[in-house]
Amino acid sequence: MGNVKKQFILQDKKFRGFCIYRLLFGISYSVMIPIIPLFFKSIGMETITIGMVISLYGVSKTFMQIPFGIVSDKVGDKLTLKIALMLMALVPIGYIFSDTTFKAGSLYVIQGAILGMAAPATYSVLARTLNVKRRGECTGLASAVFTLGGGIGAAIASFILSKFNSFNMAFNIAALGIFLTLIYVVIRVDKVKVEKGKINNKASIGEVLYEIKNRGFVYKIIILSSSAVLGDYIYSCVVALIHFYGQDVLNVSTGYTSAIISVYLLVFGLAAPIAGWVSDKIGNRKQFLYSFLLMNFTLLGLIITRNITIFTVIIILYFLGATYLNASVQSCLSEFGAYPKIKGLVFGIVGASESLGYAVGPLVSSYIYEYNKNFLFLGLLIVSVLVTIIYLALFNKSKI
């Protein structure tokens, strides 16, 4: 019994605290995020404008992550996280008082920027609380609990809208939940001592870049960044366009396409810890390759098939490939936690790349879809193959 207890990954108090934070934030944030497009529509925002605002959300999140990766190293990840959560708790309240589309849209862009502030600090806290001998398993579980929280939050939001038809109720609950998450972080997430004077001027930034180059991490960062772009590029495209593809090409109901998105969350939530465990066993180098192969072959299958049963099986396999890829990215990224001078910048770069994929994906795919509806998954396959080529060209130099 004692051995089983030691083997249970959440026995570690610090890592358990991080996972509870991610679960609480996932629930609270997801009470707000899925209903925002509907809220925009309810106050008169045009569909095309909603798409532009969502892309700008991704852009603002992208641009904030690199500088706040450096800020996180300078002032401490816990302080950065507390400031971001405090600001984020005010955002849902702001929507209650947003009586014009301009105010609401601007607030959503600011929301993306605040999330960008929090992302590098979140990576940093994870990197210093996980068990380095079970790195993949820890990062997989951390991703899974956030996804689980997202599913719970989305279900709460759906219930509120269907039962009470009240955006304000959902926003108030989201604000309260984020504020409680802030209190939890203040109490339960440990603070680490910050080494002053490391990266507070231009010369020290140069030192950071020199250390990245000197340690041979450039190629590894390129692989992680391109993989991060790919993951959110394809996910954002599927979320944005799967409803239209289902109606126009597959001739299915929105109920089916909504279920596909829910299945993605379910697959990711259940498979992420397993994917992390597998990466610990076989190594990230092999898992990257197997994930790319599975994703590319399944995207090819999605281009060809119009049979609903086959389409469903193939897209679930694709989701598995994406989950395993994400597990390897998170596992490799957490390794930079051992390098205090460079970790903030690296977390910011990879996080910004992820946000860039989320911002650019729907825009590019919308043009492709408008040109030819049957080319949606072909466009995604091309991007996936390009990232695979980058990996194959650089993995020997990348120290993965």
Language-model segments: residues:
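Juxtamembrane intracellular "pre-TM" segments in multi-pass secondary transporters
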Residues: 1-12, 192-224
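Helix-to-loop junctions at the C-terminal end of transmembrane segments
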Residues: 66-76, 272-283
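Short amphipathic helix-loop junctions that connect adjacent transmembrane helices
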Residues: 35-48, 240-255
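Residue-level signature of mid-helix packing/kink "hotspots" within the transmembrane helices
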Residues: 58-66, 150-151, 265-273, 355-359
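Symmetry-related core transmembrane helices of the 12-TM Major Facilitator Superfamily/SLC fold
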Residues: 169-186, 377-392
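Structural signature of the two symmetry-related core transmembrane helices
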Residues: 79-93, 286-301
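Intracellular juxtamembrane helix-capping segments at the cytosolic ends
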Residues: 117-130, 324-338
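Cytoplasmic helix-loop-helix junction between adjacent transmembrane helices
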Residues: 109-146
